[in-house]
Amino acid sequence: MQIKLILCPIDFSEFSARAYRYALSLAEHYHAKLVALHVVEIWRHPSASFSTTADLYQKFRQAFLENGGLQLQEFVKEHASPEIQRELVVQEGTAADEILSCARTHRADLIAMGTHGRRGFDRLMLGSVTDRVMRAASCPVLVVSSRSRDAAVAATERHPHRLDRILLCTDFSENSERALNYAVSVAEEYSAEITLLNVLEHAPAPAEQKSAIAAAQKQLDKLISPEQHKSLKIKTAMRVGKAYEQIVKLAEEAQSDLLVVGVHGRGALDAAIFGSTTYRVMQLGSCPVLAVPA
């Protein structure tokens, strides 16, 4: 896996600043180009929406775009990193559409976004934008919540991030295979420890539970070949209970720096590997979540 270009949408909030700092760290590590995108949704501004003439609307439009560009320049200056190649992009339109369009145009390998991390997924930093981007993006989407530990990923003084412990959640489906490969690649890149987690959410009868756990454990042990990944530090974990609760609990216990999950990317996000679990983990988890499309 190669990360040559990272796209980071910016709305100038503390949440997008957090995601941008994380993106800077990754760009520095992978020697990747970082594209900072700000989307101007002019239709949200009453002064432009109620313009009485086309000329007046164009004046408002130009002013909003110019102001967005100036704000983006100032934002990037506050998070300077001379070693990283950056590009600033200001687009007019609907946030999710422009993010996806920019990702396609620039052939982004990763999209990094921030969220409030509050209860209710509709309270994401970009509203339903993160939802739409996760479902439609062809590249992985890194979601950095306000609950994420600032020291989660610490490689440089300017961008204190490092990846020492990665947690991969799997249900053994084909959809989670790409997430596994991605997690392994990142773990090898950072010489990180990787923990493979499976949650037995619908536990069978007590008499059958032991054999079910043993069968799942056997599948976990086969996911990564120690012979093919000799330098990789591999752990496995089996849990019984509500998936999101067990994932969040283990991530905190293990002090995971990154949680990797697979998503279908089609239809409602309820079709994600863990259904609504992905949402809940993003709300409650203390580390960034990397959603990898199947």
Task: Indicate where each model-derived feature is located.
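Small/aliphatic-rich secondary-structure junction motif
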Residues: 1-54, 159-210, 224, 233, ...
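Structural beta-alpha unit
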Residues: 1-2, 15, 22, 66, ...
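Gly/Ser-rich helix-loop-strand patches that form or flank binding pockets
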Residues: 2-4, 25, 29, 100-152, ...
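Well-ordered alpha-helical segments embedded in enzymatic catalytic cores
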Residues: 19, 71, 98, 179-182, ...
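Short, well-ordered secondary-structure micro-motifs
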Residues: 47-48, 124, 154-155, 179-180, ...
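A short acidic, glycine-rich active-site loop
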Residues: 55-70, 207-215
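Conserved beta-strand segments of alpha/beta enzyme cores
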Residues: 85-87, 140, 193, 233-235, ...
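A short, basic/flexible loop-to-alpha-helix module at the beginning of a structural domain
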Residues: 151-160
